[in-house]
């Protein structure tokens, strides 16, 4: 089924090649975890394969799910607060650095 696959078909569903790789790899890990914990899946909340396929390879299953429209891909922007160092805001850090320089010059 993947022999006739063209990457352009999948890029219509994802923003970039990088996004395609990340999304299918993450889903393949989920499918792998699903098969490793067969029987406990309901309690763990791990979804099984969403398409009927002859393949047993998690990455192939993930690509087929994306191709069938069963895999929704979205990326979240990192929170601005998480990008800044914990504690002081940038203005406070600059002010503190200036005070340290003043103390060193005295």
UniProtKB/Swiss-Prot annotation:
GO terms for biological process: DNA-templated transcription. Residues 92-106 have a biased composition (Basic and acidic residues). The keyword Transcription applies. It comes from the Bacteria. SUPFAM superfamilies: RPB6/omega subunit-like (SSF63562). It catalyses: RNA(n) + a ribonucleoside 5'-triphosphate = RNA(n+1) + diphosphate. GO terms for molecular function: DNA binding; DNA-directed RNA polymerase activity. Keywords: DNA-directed RNA polymerase, Nucleotidyltransferase, Transcription, Transferase. Its EC number is 2.7.7.6. Disulfide bonds: none annotated. One of its GO terms (cellular component) is DNA-directed RNA polymerase complex. It is an enzyme of class 2 (transferase). Pfam families: RNA_pol_Rpb6 (PF01192). Residues 76-106 are annotated as: Disordered. The keyword Nucleotidyltransferase applies. Belongs to the RNA polymerase subunit omega family. NCBIfam families: rpoZ. The RNAP catalytic core consists of 2 alpha, 1 beta, 1 beta' and 1 omega subunit. When a sigma factor is associated with the core the holoenzyme is formed, which can initiate transcription. HAMAP family: RNApol_bact_RpoZ (MF_00366). Promotes RNA polymerase assembly. Latches the N- and C-terminal regions of the beta' subunit thereby facilitating its interaction with the beta and alpha subunits. This is DNA-directed RNA polymerase subunit omega. The gene is rpoZ.
